[in-house]
Amino acid sequence: MKVALFGGTFNPIHIGHLIMAQYVLNFSQVQKVIFVPNGHPPHKVEDVADAFDRFEMVKLSIEDNPYFDISDFEIKKSNPSWTIDTLEYFSSIYERVYFIIGSDNLSEIVKWYKAEEILKRYPLIVLPRERNLCAIKKEIEKLSSKYAQDITLIQMPVIDISSTEIRKLISQDKSIRYMVHPKVEEYIKRKGLFKR
């Protein structure tokens, strides 16, 4: 089976994440998208919900879609997980593993731990996070020519919604209706998440 890994903090997961994952299913060769919430995001320390809560919110968001799955691989690790470790783990289970990346991270991926190994061994699925398609395509061409890897750009509208904005609205006692799955909205209210 061909799967795509969708890693992220998902703090919280929102409708934009779900739409992006559905576009990956619609316009790539993958048969399943696996959401992989970060356990200990080293670059994000403030206002990050507990890993268990973030995992539960993803689970609630995707439970009615048989083509979406979730993994606690990174959450179960006691230390921050490197992307290469996650990709290698899933490669031992699945026939082909694709890595979903936002176009805003394309120029940064070369600085990641074991970047060359990632770029040589794993095909990328790029989701547009900005509207400048020419710049995105240039970056893809640069990486493709250097690493001779399969990089697919998913042509889709830019989803202009962010977890940061959702947390801000919650802290101001504003509605997040339609921005997250209704079960996630209910979970956030019940647990009192993201209140300052």
Swiss-Prot record:
E.C. no: 2.7.7.18
UniProt KW keywords: ATP-binding, NAD, Nucleotide-binding, Nucleotidyltransferase, Pyridine nucleotide biosynthesis, Transferase
GO BP: NAD biosynthetic process
Gene Ontology molecular functions: ATP binding; nicotinate-nucleotide adenylyltransferase activity
Keyword Iron-sulfur in record: no
Pathway: Cofactor biosynthesis; NAD(+) biosynthesis; deamido-NAD(+) from nicotinate D-ribonucleotide: step 1/1
Reactions catalysed according to its record: nicotinate beta-D-ribonucleotide + ATP + H(+) = deamido-NAD(+) + diphosphate
Pfam families registered for this protein in UniProt: CTP_transf_like
Enzyme class: transferase
Cross-referenced InterPro entries: Cyt_trans-like, NadD/NMNAT, Rossmann-like_a/b/a_fold
Similarity comment: Belongs to the NadD family.
PANTHER family according to UniProt: NICOTINATE-NUCLEOTIDE ADENYLYLTRANSFERASE-RELATED, PHOSPHOPANTETHEINE ADENYLYLTRANSFERASE
Its biological purpose: Catalyzes the reversible adenylation of nicotinate mononucleotide (NaMN) to nicotinic acid adenine dinucleotide (NaAD).
Protein name per Swiss-Prot or TrEMBL: Probable nicotinate-nucleotide adenylyltransferase
Name of the coding gene: nadD
